[in-house]
Amino acid sequence: MAGGTQGVAAIVPAAGSGQRLAAGVPKAFYQLEGQTLVERAVRGLFESGVVDTVVVAVPPDRTDEAKLILGREATIVAGGADRTESVSRALSALSAGVSPEFVLVHDAARALTPPALVVRLVDMLRAGHAAVVPVLPLTDTIKAVDANGVVLGTPERAGLRAVQTPQGFSTELLLRAYRHAGVSAFTDDASLVEHVGGQVHVVGGDPLAFKITNRLDLLLAHAVVRG
């Protein structure tokens, strides 16, 4: 990236098929009470007042549709074969303009994330932390299980957290993490940063930042929007 640093950019990987949702369309394009999930996710980022630009990675055959839905609100790029490739392509798209100081990566499926959570995250970044993720304490007991279905142990719940998005990073750290991503499978961007030795801090998450993955999640999302 060239031309100095400025502001906060957000990347929204929205190229997944959404097979578990079984909605008949890619998950990000599901209509939740009149607005697609990706539309709600992007607008929530802007409503925070701390995000300057958004890049959305969508299925290659949905780029025109995404441009119609989002208009000039976001830059649209064709996503890749997996989440890591989609985010990488979105990062490349950011290089066309002024390099942001920070980059947030936010799941389109967490479409109801409150703008206040985005503000808390960016405040932590501006306070000097290079990587910040929102988390919630676990309420269920967690078991480690082997391939044969045998319980190996019970991790101490007090030290475990469920991780949400958006996840925020200094641009330099996130770019370095993606340069060293290789072929390893990472389920989130914080894992990539941990892989290159980055220290990740946490900020309090929000129950409304839940990930819409299955039909039960959809029922909850509709209920939340309807109030």
Curated annotation (Swiss-Prot):
CDD domains: CDP-ME_synthetase
Positions bearing the site annotation: Transition state stabilizer: 20, 27
Keyword Glycosyltransferase belongs to the record: no
Pathway given in the UniProt record: Isoprenoid biosynthesis; isopentenyl diphosphate biosynthesis via DXP pathway; isopentenyl diphosphate from 1-deoxy-D-xylulose 5-phosphate: step 2/6
Pfam families in the cross-refs: IspD (PF01128)
HAMAP family linked: IspD
Protein name: 2-C-methyl-D-erythritol 4-phosphate cytidylyltransferase
Role according to the record: Catalyzes the formation of 4-diphosphocytidyl-2-C-methyl-D-erythritol from CTP and 2-C-methyl-D-erythritol 4-phosphate (MEP).
Family: Belongs to the IspD/TarI cytidylyltransferase family. IspD subfamily.
Gene3D superfamilies per UniProt: Spore Coat Polysaccharide Biosynthesis Protein SpsA, Chain A (3.90.550.10)
Origin: domain of life: Bacteria
NCBIfam families named in the record: ispD
